[in-house]
From Swiss-Prot:
Binding annotation for ATP: 849-856
Chief localisation class: membrane
SUPFAM superfamilies xref list: P-loop containing nucleoside triphosphate hydrolases
Keyword line: ATP-binding, Membrane, Nucleotide-binding, Repeat, Transmembrane, Transmembrane helix, Transport
A UniProt-annotated Pfam family: ABC_tran
Gene Ontology MF term list: ABC-type transporter activity; ATP binding; ATP hydrolysis activity
Name of the protein this chain belongs to: ABC-type transporter adrC
Membrane topology reported for the UniProt record: Multi-pass membrane protein
Claim: Protein biosynthesis is one of the keywords in the record: no
Function: ABC-type transporter; part of the gene cluster that mediates the biosynthesis of the meroterpenoid compound andrastin A, a promising antitumoral compound. Is required for the production of andrastin A but does not have a significant role in its secretion.
Transmembrane segments annotated in the record for this chain: 487-507, 524-544, 569-589, 598-618, 631-651, 738-758, 1149-1169, 1181-1201, 1224-1244, 1264-1284, 1287-1307, 1322-1344, 1415-1435
Keyword Cell membrane: no
Subcellular location: Membrane
Length: 1452
């Protein structure tokens, strides 16, 4: 398109977008600078002063024009880039078809895969090509200042094309034959050196929720601010100016100091959040990307999704203005484009199953395909016509051209490559390559510009504008802002650590400074260092929460990932220092540790360094993994290794040689030895127990009964004690600290390096996953033989015929005076205000309005699905009040497609039909009806496909069809609600769904649907319109009329401008009431105009008639008035079957669970390999049980996210639809875990029991230990459900579970015998369920085993002269618990303090006689968990829901 044609094409749109300008016309805007130097200086000064609150708004287009002229035309011209691509071919990893994995297939894979490969080799078969071609040889040129419209159906390769243009190739493979250049700059050079000039704007939003909108945008502006700022203003002035212009432009000025927020952090509203990105403002999807990131090339992937028509047009017009003024070029993928939006673009590319079938001027696209032989239906917009060409079920050949037109993607591609238009494109490409050769001249120009824009110390080869120190400073500021904005989280963490420290300190309160406190001192130090270090596990969650943000900013060339990592470390240091000091002071002084200043500060120093080292280790683990599940699994391995090989639970001299080396790689080993040596060195502890008793003077013929004692001494040296107990030495203290610091430095360097080196998350590429045995053979051949993606049956017969079994409906749903208020800070906010209307049989009603008008809110209110707030007004079905069956008798297709990801489409539909259709209908009839729905929706080819998660399973279109199918399968008796059923779909799918809704309405089904961007043809499918303005107030309710004349005449009669014959009525209506990015002001009060209209009075009259004349539309059948269609037992059967199936089909969850349990068992078993019968051996056995308990936390944290995801599905979709009872839900969630937990208990028992206890015990003992182990795992699952049943999030549930588990673990008698507990804490030993678990197993396994002291444990002393050992100790041995090894010896008497394991257990209040009692008590705890989970779920999740419904009903 010629430049003058582009200006001409844009004149109307740009005038509309610039209509608010008072002093500068659009002609002035496009033709040059503002009319006078004074005007230019005025705007420049206003821009400089923009950081002052209360300054007037600055028009963004004039501001951009002025700043462009101030920057200099040379700079702008040099930065402008074109996109040239030739033979662009892109491959993806893996095939388009996969078979669903199950637990069995995952277990057999190590055997099945080698066998399969061997058979392939023997059979001389070609190995499967594990990649698929997504794009096939694309060609084209996009010049600077141009806009490219990317058209194609979902799955055609639009996203891949956009990513390829901007170098976002993670998970993709660019074929070597491909050539991409940017006005003489090669692809690789552009990506490496000028990455900030290429921006791919994906659909998902990622922000730091605790940053304000202003802070978020200022960071982006700082990162890309040129060193030579406009007009020589300071960097801060430039940033403030740009941010103010952007926020003024898109109506976000009022959110400057408001947190961005997310689903869990309060912040701006969903619509406003959609408009905010770390580099730009999206949602209105405006020019802010160019203003803030200053990109030359931008690709926008379906960025208009979810926006109303007026806002979508405003967004593209702003891109048009940017391209005109700054010379940028934009490629925009749009699935639903109106004619006005289509005409804004310069060029169009059309994709058909990964093949380019047209690239060229926008004006010639339609004519090209008409010349080819395709017929354009009347009133079909250009973009819809082009997209329809790629749909065999929609395109129509011209008469006589049926056999001449191409049909397959390959034929279309061949036709295109042999066309004159393609020849012209090839000529242009040859001329372009001659004009702009790939030499270094353009690169030199860019380097010169970048050198001017870069800071002084930035590398010229770096794509970043800021130097590394400047990036670090910028990231430090942002990290501090995030920390300051999230004070509650800091307080919560500090309080949690304080509470844990208080518990540990009080558990060992005032340890005596004699030998009775020796073991207690070591124990409290072990717990202190371990808990402080393990708190750092939260670093994994923190890193994953910001990972996508950091990756995106690196892609936009804002900051290096490692600079963000360095900033985090620096900002975290004072926080960690404060927490360490707080924890140390509490534990140190409560436990009465060594009260000397030097030793206290050495303790602090070790603890702080250990915490920072462990935090860095966990961050490194998070960096090298791709999912948080992988990171947590690795962290679990690290934790168990650290806990076992610290040197406390297994002393160095007892460590097995095969695992003993781990201690040298364990930072906590060096920390523990350092603080233990620091505590005990140079101290003498008075002995409190002697052998024999000191009843008289005995010279040197006695010894203290503690390790490290010397015959004749009345004290024990601290150095001797730690040497004898742990093989520690004070000489290692500073060596250990040096090693600890070395660990810290090493992991810092490794973490920073890996953060920069390792790519982050791999983007998901939608592939179909079929149930084993459910995939059609022709699909297998099509995919595996050709390596191409599967193309599913077109949705072509949605409106062809509605199933005959659908009875004609006679129900009318009406509402009058509906208002909805929600509580906000300082009062209430009204979201809906006096909304009235009806939906009658045979009518299709559209619900429209500007973004944020309350369309989804009204839909939820009408469906009685609001969870907060107060609804007032009346709702009736056939003049009757709504009863308990209303929710079940309607179909509600939500905007979010929520499904069980492991089910197939057929299974999901059958589940809905089985539980929501009446009991009187046989199961065979229900399943036959499901097959009708599958045929109706065109899903026969993939009915056995697994739903999967977004990006890994069904695509967006298929999910939307499934959501509709689930509601249809239920045979709703009253009406169907559809919330944004066409959102994210292409025009063909949108048309098919609307045509299907039309057919349902024609058969008597009342239908109410919200729509955002309807084309004129699609809009005509609706009979009636409810039009809302901001604030949830009615603008119009009534008939639409043919070609929308009824509603248009109403608006024009009230003062709106005339709607042109080529305008889209939906866009026109939104414009005249003040829609768009900034909500253009209007002089007409449309709400009051509606209240004064005759149409409003007719509405009220009709509502009165409907309310006063109840019809007999609702049956008296008990099914119609009951809350659920099926009895509880039937509900339980179907839900339990689905849940068991879901677990079996998620091997990653089951195998992770079993992997953790079995690894823990094997590792502990081999670490405590066949402990001997010494006192230390028995203590090792007890510690092995203590450490085995630590798997509890891993299991609980695995179960809770699973429970919450199922609860979300139930509470958002299945409970409101009254699919099944909450009793069935909670019971099935508890029971479905039990088979796997039982099997896990058996596997874990087998992996550790024989390693630790040997195989010589009786089968009765082995069986009882097995029962206790199975009990433990059942307790873990029921405990997880008890905790998570009532909490709103996994984070809170994890904190509660971890804290409760810590209490149970600390007070089970292992670390501190009950007799040594402070009086206050004795009850906790009895309350802790782990007391009975540890007591039961240890008593069963150790009862009756004799003790044979090792040489370290024997107490050695000489008898008096003239006596042997037996004579000397004869009286003492009558009452003593121990044994004398050498009674006849006259020197070196060897006394073992204990003779049998039961004596050791008795000190911990463990008895053989209590084993079955403990077994029974443990079951009581399990039963308590089950009852508690049911009760808590009812009290916190069900009862409030019931009360809300009752409240709404009473107010109605």
């Amino acid at each position: 398109m010629a430049p003058e044609e582009g200006d001409q094409a844009m004149s109307h749109e740009d005038k509309a977008a610039c209509s608010s300008l008072n002093t500068t016309s659009s002609t002035e805007l496009f033709d040059g600078a503002p009319s006078s130097e004074n005007e230019r200086l005025r705007i420049r000064q206003a821009a400089v002063d923009a950081m002052h609150h209360g300054s007037p708004k600055i028009d963004p287009q004039i501001w951009t024009d002025v700043t462009s002229h101030l920057s200099g035309s040379t700079t702008i011209d040099a930065r402008q880039r074109d996109i040239f691509f030739e033979n662009l071919t892109v491959h993806g990893k893996g095939s388009s078809l996969q078979i669903q994995k199950t637990v069995l297939s995952a277990l057999l894979y190590p055997i099945a895969y080698p066998v399969k490969r061997l058979m392939s080799i023997v059979g001389n078969k070609k190995p499967h090509n594990d990649r698929r071609t997504i794009l096939h040889g694309f060609n084209g040129i996009l010049n600077s200042g141009e806009l490219l419209l990317v058209l194609g159906r979902p799955g055609s390769g639009c996203s891949t094309f956009l990513k390829s243009l901007c170098g976002y190739l993670e998970g993709l493979d660019l074929d070597p034959v491909s050539e991409i250049q940017y006005r003489g700059v090669p692809f690789r050079v552009m990506i490496e050196k000028y990455r900030g000039d290429l921006v791919y704007n994906q659909e998902a939003d990622h922000h730091f929720p605790n940053l304000t909108v202003g802070q978020t945008l200022e960071f982006a502006a700082h990162a890309r601010a040129p060193h030579n700022q406009v007009g020589n203003s300071s960097r801060d002035q430039y940033v403030k100016s740009v941010v103010k212009v952007v926020m003024d432009t898109f109506g976000l000025s009022h959110t400057y100091d408001t947190n961005v927020g997310n689903d869990f952090v309060p912040g701006v509203s969903g619509g406003e959040r959609k408009r905010v990105r770390t580099d730009t403002i999206v949602g209105m999807n405006s020019i802010a990307e160019t203003v803030l990131s200053r990109t030359s090339i931008a690709a926008w992937d379906n960025s208009t999704r979810g926006l109303d028509a007026a806002t979508a047009v405003d967004f593209v017009r702003s891109l048009r203005t940017s391209a005109k003024l700054a010379g940028s070029c934009h490629a925009v993928a749009v699935y639903q484009a109106s004619e006005g939006l289509y005409n804004t673009f310069d060029k169009v590319i059309l994709l058909y199953e990964g093949r380019e079938i047209y690239f060229g001027p926008r004006q010639g696209a339609v004519a090209y395909f008409e010349t080819m032989g395709w017929k354009r239906p009347p009133q079909q917009v250009s973009a819809d016509f082009l997209t329809a060409i790629t749909n065999p079920g929609e395109r129509q050949p011209q008469v006589g051209m049926e056999n001449a037109v191409p049909r397959t993607p390959v034929e279309f591609e061949s036709y295109w490559k042999n066309s004159p238009e393609h020849a012209e494109l090839e000529t242009s490409m040859r001329q372009y390559k001659m004009k702009t050769p790939l030499d270094s001249s353009e690169e030199i120009k860019l380097d010169e510009i970048k050198r001017l824009e870069q800071s002084n110390h930035a590398r010229i080869s770096s794509p970043y504008l800021l130097s590394v120190p400047m990036q670090i400073r910028l990231c430090i500021v942002r990290a501090w802002q995030r920390t300051r904005n999230d004070i509650p989280a800091l307080i919560a963490t500090a309080v949690a650590q304080t509470v844990v420290s208080l518990i540990i300190g009080s558990l060992f309160y005032n340890i005596p400074e004699n030998t009775a406190g020796l073991g207690q001192r070591a124990s409290v130090l072990f717990l202190a260092v371990l808990t402080n270090a393990l708190i750092s596990l939260l670093e994994i969650t923190t890193l994953y929460s910001q990972r996508l943000i950091v990756e995106k900013q690196a892609a936009y060339a804002f900051v290096h990932p490692f600079t963000e990592a360095i900033a985090e470390v620096i900002v975290d240091f004072p926080i960690k220092l404060f927490r360490c000091l707080l924890s140390a002071i509490i534990v140190y002084f409560l436990a009465n540790l060594r009260r000397e200043a030097s030793h206290f500060f050495i303790y602090i120093m070790f603890q702080l360094t250990a915490v920072m080292t462990m935090a860095t280790i966990f961050r490194t683990l998070a960096t090298v993994t791709r999912t948080i599940g992988q990171a947590m699994a690795l962290a679990g391995v690290v934790i168990i290794c650290i806990a076992v090989y610290t040197g406390f639970t297994v002393p160095q001299f007892d460590m097995p040689p095969w695992f003993g080396w781990i201690r040298w790689l364990n930072p906590i080993f060096y920390t523990f030895e350092g603080i233990v040596s620091n505590e005990f060195h140079g101290r003498h502890f008075e002995c409190v127990e002697y052998i024999p008793s000191l009843s008289f003077e005995q010279g040197l013929s006695f010894t203290c009964s503690y390790v490290g004692s010397i015959a004749g001494e009345r004290y024990v040296s601290g150095d001797a004690y730690i040497a004898g107990s742990y093989d520690y030495s004070y000489d290692h203290v500073w060596r250990n600290y040096g090693i600890l610091v070395a660990f810290l430095v090493f992991f810092y360097v490794l973490y920073f390096w890996l953060t920069e080196l390792i790519p982050g998350t791999t983007p998901a590429h939608e592939v179909l996953i079929f149930r084993h045995g459910g995939v059609l053979q022709r699909l297998v051949r099509g995919d595996l033989e050709r390596g191409e993606s599967i193309r599913l049956q077109e949705v072509k017969s949605l409106a062809s015929e509605v199933h005959s079994s659908k009875a004609e409906q006679k129900n009318t749903f009406s509402w009058k005076g509906l208002s909805y208020d929600i509580p906000v800070k300082g009062g209430e906010k009204r979201l809906l205000d006096d909304v009235s209307g009806w939906v009658k049989p045979g009518s299709l009603t559209a619900l429209m309005g500007v973004s944020g008008a309350g369309k989804t809110t009204l839909m939820n209110v009408l469906a009685r699905r609001m969870t907060i707030g107060v609804v007032t007004g009346d709702m009736f079905v056939n003049g009757r009040e709504l009863d308990a069956s209303f929710a079940r008798n309607i179909g509600y297709v939500q905007q979010q497609d929520l499904h069980v990801e492991t089910c197939t489409i057929r299974e999901a539909l059958r589940f809905s039909a089985a539980l929501r259709q009446p009991q009187s209908v046989s199961m065979e009839e229900k399943y036959n009806f499901v097959e009708e729905v599958i045929q109706l929706l065109g899903m026969q080819n993939f009915a056995e496909a697994v739903i999967g998660s977004p990006g890994d399973g069904l695509n967006m279109e298929q999910r939307k069809l499934l959501s509709i199918g689930v509601e249809l399968a239920a045979k709703p008796q009253l009406l169907i609600f559809l919330d944004e059923p066409t959102s994210g779909l292409d025009s063909r799918s949108s048309w098919a769904i609307c045509a299907f809704m039309r057919k349902l309405a024609d058969h008597g089904q009342p239908v109410l649907a919200t729509i955002h961007q309807p084309s004129a043809v699609l809009f005509e499918q609706f009979d009636r319109l409810l039009f809302l303005a901001k604030g949830g107030r009615t603008v119009y309710f009534g008939d639409i009329g043919k070609q929308a004349r009824t509603v248009l005449e109403y608006l024009e009669d009230k003062g709106a401008r005339h709607c042109g014959p080529t305008e889209n009525p939906a866009e026109y209506m939104l414009e005249v009431i003040g829609g768009g990015t900034q909500g253009q002001s209007t002089s007409i009060d449309w709400v009051q105009a509606w209240k004064r209209s005759t149409e409003y009075n007719k509405l009220l009259g009709e509502l009165d008639i409907l309310a006063s004349s109840p019809s007999n539309g609702v049956s008296a059948d008990p099914y119609m008035v009951g809350e659920f269609a099926m009895p509880l037992l039937v509900q339980f059967y179907h839900v339990m079957k689905r849940d068991l199936q879901q677990y079996y089909r998620q091997p990653e969850y089951i195998l992770a669970k079993f992997g953790a349990g079995v690894f823990c068992g094997v590792f502990i078993g081999f670490s405590f390999w066949k402990s001997d019968n010494s006192s230390q051996g028995f203590q090792n056995v007890l510690f092995s049980l203590f450490l085995l308990c630590t798997i509890f936390s891993t299991l609980v944290n695995q179960i809770m996210p699973k429970f919450l995801s199922r609860r979300t599905l139930y509470e958002l979709r299945e409970r409101p639809a009254r699919t099944y009872s909450w009793k069935v839900f909670i019971l099935c969630q508890i029971l479905v875990e039990l088979p796997w937990q039982t099997l896990l208990g058996i596997c874990t028992w087998a992996s550790f029991y024989f390693s630790v206890y040997g195989s010589g015990q009786s089968s009765q003992r082995q069986g009882l230990v097995l029962l206790f182990t199975v009990q433990f795992f059942i307790f873990a699952s029921t405990f997880a459900q008890l905790v998570v049943a009532a909490v709103p999030s996994v984070v809170l549930g994890s904190m509660l579970a971890t804290f409760t588990f810590l209490l149970c673990l600390l007070f089970n008698g292992t670390m501190q015998p009950p007799s040594a507990l402070p009086r206050f804490w004795i009850f906790m030993n009895r309350v802790s369920p782990l007391t009975y678990y540890v007591g039961g197993i240890s008593a069963t396994a150790l009862h009756g085993r004799p003790i044979h002291c090792s040489n370290r444990e024997l107490r050695v002393f000489d008898p008096p002269q003239g006596q042997n050992c037996g004579q000397y100790l004869a009286e003492y041995l009558k009452t003593a618990q121990g044994t004398l090894s050498n009674p006849l010896s006259t020197d070196q008497c060897q006394y073992c303090p204990l003779r049998v394991a039961d004596q050791y257990l008795a000190a911990r209040d463990i008895s053989w006689d209590d084993r079955w009692r403990n077994f029974g008590i443990f079951w009581v705890y399990i039963i308590f968990n089950v009852i508690g989970a049911v009760l808590l779920y009812y009290l916190f999740r069900v009862l409030p829901y019931i009360r809300r419904n009752r409240t709404q009903k009473s107010r109605n």
